[in-house]
Every structure is written in C-alpha cells, then in structure tokens.
Amino acid sequence: MGKIWRISGPLVIGEDMKGAQVYEIVEIGTQRLVGEVIGLEEDKAIIQVHEDTLELKVGEAIRGTGAILTAELGPGIVGSIYDGLQKSLTVLMEQGSFIERGARVFPLPRDKKWPFTPKVKVGDRVSQGDIIGTVPETHLLEHRIMVPVGMKGIIKKIAEGNYTIEEPVAQIEVDGKVKEITMLQKWPVRKPRPYKQRFAPSKLLVTGMRILDYMFPLALGGKAAIPGGFGTGKTVALQQLARWAQTQLNIYVGCGERGNEMADVLYSFRQLKEPTTGRLLQEKEVFIANTSNMPVVAREASVFVGITLAEYFRDMGYDVLLVADSTSRWAEAMREIGGRLEEIPGEEGFPAYLGSRLSSFYERAGRVECLGSPGREGSVTVAGAVSPPGADFSEPVTQNTLRIVDAFYALDTSLANKRHFPAINWLTSYSLYVD
C-alpha cells in the first residue's frame, strides 16, 4: 500500500497511502507490526502502532489489510487472559517468557471441540440475536450461540454434536441462498452492539461492599468512577468489585497499571472460590492485561476490546461487570499521541476530545432488552478507576469522568493514611441511583 515516511515513537506517518481508510489495520515493516490508521491527509496516513517501533526504518513497507480492529467472539473467552489487542497471553507464554514483536496468535482456540446443543429445529424462522443453541463453556456460565447481527432466514440444517468454533453448526436460507453459522463471530471494537431498547437503571447491583450497597448503591447497567491518589486503594477496591459483585460475568481490564498488580490479580483469582457454588472464581472472569510497560497505544484498544466482550455476553441475557484500572493511563496515552501529532492541547496538555473519548466508552454501559428470541434482558455495568496526580480531583480526567458517571466513590488520602479501607469518603462520594 505504501511506505514509512516518518517515525515518532509509537506514531508512524506513511506516504503513498491512497486507498487507506480511517481505523484500518495495517502491517508495518519486515516484522509486520500491527498499526491502526487514525488520520489521512492527501496521500499520507497517520498510523498509531500497537507494538514497539524499535528498529523500524524510514522507507519500509506498509501493507493494508482492508479490515478494522475487531474482537473475536465465541466459546473460549471466559477464563482467558488477553493483552490489549486480544492476543492470548496463555498461548504466547508457551512461545517464551517475553512477547516477541509481530507475534500472531488466535484469541480463541481453533482446534478445541465444544458440545453444541440446538435450541431450534429445521424449518424454524430465525433472525438476528435469536439463540439457536448453547455450549457449556464453564460450570458457571452457559455460552449461548446467537444468529449474527444482520442475518435472518429459515433453518435448513442444525444438529447436536461436538464442533470447533470454525465448523458450521447450522445452515440458514437467506433470500434463496444458504449461509452457514459458526460459533465464531467478529465485531468492530469501536462500534456498539445493537439492542431492542434501553431501560432506565432501576435494579440494584449487589457489589458485596457494604459501604457501597448501603450508602452509595450501584445499579445494574450503571456507570461508576473510583478516583483517588496514590496508595488510596483504587486497585484493591476494583478487585473487590470483580470478586464479589452479583453478576454472571466479570471482565477485568488492567489498562496501563503496574505489572505486579496484574500478577496479583491473576494469582488471587485462581485461588478464590465463587461463594454460592464453590467453583473457582476464574470460571466467571475474563482478564485483559495491558500493563504500564506495554505499548501505550494498546491502552485504548484494551478498554474497547473489554467493553465489546461485555456487550456480547450482555446480548446473551447476562449481567456483566467491567472494571477498568485505570482510565487515567488511557488518557495519558491520548495526551502522548496528541503531542506527537502536534495537536493544539487542551487543559493540562490533554487533547480537546478527551471528554468525547471517555463518553464513547462509559456510555456503552446500560441495561437493555436484547435482540432476538427468547426475550431476555442483559446489562453492562462499568466501574473505572481514575488516578489524579496528587489526589487533585479538579484535573481534567476526573472532571470529564464526573460529567458522565452517576456514581462517584471518592477515595480519601487521609483515610488511607489511617489504614481505613476502603478509603471511601462518605461526605464527598455520592450515587444518583438512590431514590
């Protein structure tokens, strides 16, 4: 498609890029590093690279893929550990202790067979969102196979059996043509998944933290922020939410935080048991680890991959909790990219579009009526940590987040210094979900 014209850290500008589209995935250099087109000007393209650009040279080739950043959806997600681009870290670990640049692995296992049980029969008319079968993904969660968005027709073939995610489990006649349905679906991470209607948040989400459930309740499908200075317990508070919240699935996104904290999360969740069934808590968790030493650009991808996975399970009729630690690190990545693009900075150097980017993430939370039959409701609840420097809540990330969320759990440095945990200041915090 083109070649490298300029390199500035994680930012690459390519020339001779006519035909490229915004948010298209490209492969850069001899190692075929993954990049994403974020801007176009005449025949030049601005590309943010999701991997380390060390040893890249001006003049190396840039190859277009014609595809945009998508998440793979299907059996095998629950219990997995991904990086910000949904590469399976479990598979990458088998290749060595360090992640090689340009490494390519599938997010979902291609050779594993899953027992598929049909819920419809030949001759039934189905449309987008209809549940056509189920797969027992873990002991705690049943994976419901749905008709892909935009497809409807009559079932021509469906059978019980063991299938891989790429083998067709059903055939549908659409306008005289037969199309196959597999258990594997793909969805653009920046595009919200559709639903029938959205409900006002009215049902309580039991978080398992008494101060929240009693004084500052969080609703199913709600949005919450947990801001606090260094050492006030943001990560521990989010971990407690992910452990004990009464939801069917929890997604933990470690976005730009310390690697040892993520290692502690992974270790502890493999030991803890779900209180109602006694099964391991890992059987209802998904982990996305994008630590502070990983490429900064992938921080944005990690939160959008996480919310896309959450919406997918919401469409099955499940209540999903997504915790993001921390959205401030994502905002810092936006500030770094904005600086390298020589954009006019906003307050404290953050880009002027900081608020709209945060909104595009938080506003995908909600309790909805799902597409298809049988009729069902699902929800995505989002809780994000904010790390204001010096515990200054007047800084831009906290203030922009405050405009979006309906529950605000302010962590107090003085309480944390007294070893009062969770260090939630009951005078500053509030919840708009209280009647």
Put a short name on every predicted segment.
Residues M1-M93, S97-E100:
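N-terminal accessory targeting/assembly segments
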Residues W5-V12, L40-Q48, F106-T117, P148-I154, ...:
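Short, structured beta-strand/loop micro-motifs enriched in basic residues and often containing a Trp
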Residues M17, Q31, A67-I68, Q86, ...:
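Short, surface-exposed secondary-structure boundary micro-motifs
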Residues E27, I62-G64, S127, G133, ...:
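Hydrophobic beta-strand signal
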Residues G39-K44, P75-Q86, L141-N162, E180-P194:
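Short, compositionally biased
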Residues E42-A45, A67, M151-I155, P227, ...:
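Metallocofactor- and cofactor-centric catalytic cores in central/energy metabolism, strongly enriched
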Residues E94-P148, T164-G222, A237-Q240, P275-M294, ...:
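P-loop NTPase nucleotide-binding/switch module
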Residues Y214-M215, G221-D435:
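P-loop NTPase catalytic core
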